[in-house]
């Protein structure tokens, strides 16, 4: 579960390291986001000499959450951290690699390119 002002790690090589959530997109007054949701974020930490700078506003897709996710078969899955992948206006990832595992729900919500870049899909 990710909400307003949450800090999340970046799971790709786009140049940002830490993001802060500004808004969870989708729905009227949606306050919490889970795996597969799109969020508007501010870059809090960035790698030097990249296109992304601190304070820049970007969009991202949540790929891992600490809060468990219940699946339709009754199983639960949770991860060690909250992480996201940066996307552009066409819902394509900004980076060329995705680090760490990615939940299967990301593919089901229409981000197949992110799931295909990930080494592990849980």
From Swiss-Prot:
GO terms for molecular function: large ribosomal subunit rRNA binding; structural constituent of ribosome. InterPro entries: Ribosomal_uL14, Ribosomal_uL14_bac-type, Ribosomal_uL14_CS, Ribosomal_uL14_sf. SMART domains: Ribosomal_L14 (SM01374). Keywords: Ribonucleoprotein, Ribosomal protein, RNA-binding, rRNA-binding. GO terms for cellular component: cytosolic large ribosomal subunit. Signal peptide: none annotated. It comes from the Bacteria. Pfam families: Ribosomal_L14. One of its GO terms (biological process) is translation. Belongs to the universal ribosomal protein uL14 family. Binds to 23S rRNA. Forms part of two intersubunit bridges in the 70S ribosome. Part of the 50S ribosomal subunit. Forms a cluster with proteins L3 and L19. In the 70S ribosome, L14 and L19 interact and together make contacts with the 16S rRNA in bridges B5 and B8. This is Large ribosomal subunit protein uL14. It comes from Petrotoga mobilis (strain DSM 10674 / SJ95). The lineage of its organism: Bacteria, Thermotogati, Thermotogota, Thermotogae, Petrotogales.
């Amino acid at each position: 579960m990710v909400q307003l002002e949450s800090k999340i790690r970046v799971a790709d090589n786009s140049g940002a390291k830490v993001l802060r959530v500004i808004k969870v997109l989708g729905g009227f007054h949606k306050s919490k986001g889970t795996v597969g949701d799109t969020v508007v974020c501010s870059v809090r930490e960035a790698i030097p000499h990249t296109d992304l700078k601190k304070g820049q506003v970007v969009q991202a897709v949540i790929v891992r959450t600490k809060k468990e996710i219940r699946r339709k078969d009754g199983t639960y899955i949770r991860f060690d951290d909250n992480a996201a992948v940066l996307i552009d206006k066409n819902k394509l990832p900004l980076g060329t690699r995705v680090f760490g595992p990615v939940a299967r729900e990301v593919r089901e919500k229409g981000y197949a390119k992110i799931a295909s870049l990930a080494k592990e899909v849980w």
